[in-house]
């Protein structure tokens, strides 16, 4: 008996909507990454992009456990000497809550071409409205 290998042209993609209100950031991000990779499907093949689309709503209402909102920093480098910048997650949650979820999920995906293709299927919105009604997304409940 041969092992099944999915072919890119055979992959059927679905759209899922996830409400992030009251969810813990890391736990939610790992579930989203699993869906983007396609690990929830029986046809999962590591070298083929078998994942689905994910729409995340209410990004501003996500929860960080402990004192991470005050203690955690997002660091980035501008490219200039002395250009290492730090932004506190509390401030980042006020200005760009979509980026917080995007950044957490991106860190859980493969660091190669496949991962770059997977992250393009993640759509994050603040508020409960999105512009993907035409795709008829399914509501997905994640604890």
UniProtKB/Swiss-Prot annotation:
Superkingdom of this entry's organism? Bacteria
Presence of the UniProt keyword Ribonucleoprotein in the record:
yes
Q: How is this protein named in the record? A: Large ribosomal subunit protein uL13
What is the purpose of this protein?
Answer: This protein is one of the early assembly proteins of the 50S ribosomal subunit, although it is not seen to bind rRNA by itself. It is important during the early stages of 50S assembly.
User: What CDD domains does the record tag this protein with?
Assistant: Ribosomal_L13
What's any one GO cellular component for it?
cytosolic large ribosomal subunit
InterPro entries documented for this protein: Ribosomal_uL13, Ribosomal_uL13_bac-type, Ribosomal_uL13_CS, Ribosomal_uL13_sf
Q: Would I find Ribosomal protein among this entry's keywords?
A: yes
Q: Which GO terms describe its molecular function?
A: mRNA binding; structural constituent of ribosome
Q: Can you state the subunit structure given in the record?
A: Part of the 50S ribosomal subunit.
A Gene Ontology biological process in which this protein takes part is: negative regulation of translation
Under Pfam families, the record lists: Ribosomal_L13
Q: Which PANTHER family match?
A: LARGE RIBOSOMAL SUBUNIT PROTEIN UL13M, RIBOSOMAL PROTEIN L13
The record's similarity note reads: Belongs to the universal ribosomal protein uL13 family.
Q: Which UniProt key words apply to this protein?
A: Ribonucleoprotein, Ribosomal protein
């Amino acid at each position: 008996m041969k092992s099944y290998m999915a072919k890119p042209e055979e992959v059927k993609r679905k759209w899922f909507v996830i409400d992030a209100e009251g969810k813990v950031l890391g736990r939610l991000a790992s579930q989203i990454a699993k869906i983007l990779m396609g690990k929830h499907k029986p046809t999962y093949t590591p070298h083929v992009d078998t994942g689905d689309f994910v729409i995340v709503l209410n990004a501003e209402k996500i929860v960080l456990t402990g004192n991470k909102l005050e203690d955690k920093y997002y660091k980035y480098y501008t490219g200039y000497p002395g250009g290492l910048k730090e932004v506190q997650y509390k401030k980042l949650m006020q200005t760009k809550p979509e980026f917080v979820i995007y950044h957490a999920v991106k860190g859980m995906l493969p660091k190669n071409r496949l991962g770059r293709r997977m992250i393009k299927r993640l759509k994050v919105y603040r508020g409960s409205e999105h512009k993907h009604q035409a795709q008829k997304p399914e509501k997905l409940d994640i604890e």
